[in-house]
Amino acid sequence: MTKLLVGLGNPGDKYFETKHNVGFMLIDQLAKKQNVTFTHDKIFQADLASFFLNGEKIYLVKPTTFMNESGKAVHALLTYYGLDIDDLLIIYDDLDMEVGKIRLRAKGSAGGHNGIKSIIQHIGTHVFNRVKIGIGRPKNGMSVVHHVLSKFDRDDYIGILQSVDKVDDSVNYYLQEKNFEKTMQRYNG
């Protein structure tokens, strides 16, 4: 079996550790813990790393298409490797959730998230496993675009690092148990 773990974000130093890139942050943490490095794949339009866990190949993916076109990379990888939607896990930011909160879901709408909207359009379904990490709503009249492309303030950054650790735990639990429903029961709350 093979699993595709995709963190959403925007490529480039300009977007490093911005709110919209918490998916990349989590994928980077998983790569670091597994001691694997990313290589850029032009065909898939993604940075890829892989490792084996309990005989299962795990791909860590950071699309390099920019957020709004993330579905291109996801669809290409699913198709090339002949994977089912059940083999996919998407990790991304959610501005409708409090900073640092996490929520695991097996389906749902895009909720205004353009990366998720792109994935739904490209793979043809809204039924896929996902982990949402809260980044909070904009404050003091700040636009949504400015909010998601800005860095976390100090206190929020500490909370985000803690939530990334919790998501890391949940993803590892999911990979061990091979049961997303059980993972949701354990980590949602």
From Swiss-Prot:
The active site is at residue 20. Its main location: cytoplasm. Its EC number is 3.1.1.29. Pfam families: Pept_tRNA_hydro (PF01195). PROSITE patterns: PEPT_TRNA_HYDROL_1, PEPT_TRNA_HYDROL_2. One of its GO terms (molecular function) is tRNA binding. Keywords: Cytoplasm, Hydrolase, RNA-binding, tRNA-binding. GO terms for cellular component: cytoplasm. The record marks 93 as: Stabilizes the basic form of H active site to accept a proton. GO terms for biological process: protein quality control for misfolded or incompletely synthesized proteins; rescue of stalled ribosome. Gene3D superfamilies: Peptidyl-tRNA hydrolase. InterPro entries: Pept_tRNA_hydro, Pept_tRNA_hydro_CS, Pept_tRNA_hydro_sf. It comes from the Bacteria. CDD domains: PTH. TRNA binds at residues 15, 66, 68, 114. Monomer. Belongs to the PTH family. Hydrolyzes ribosome-free peptidyl-tRNAs (with 1 or more amino acids incorporated), which drop off the ribosome during protein synthesis, or as a result of ribosome stalling. This is Peptidyl-tRNA hydrolase. It comes from Streptococcus pneumoniae (strain CGSP14). The gene is pth.
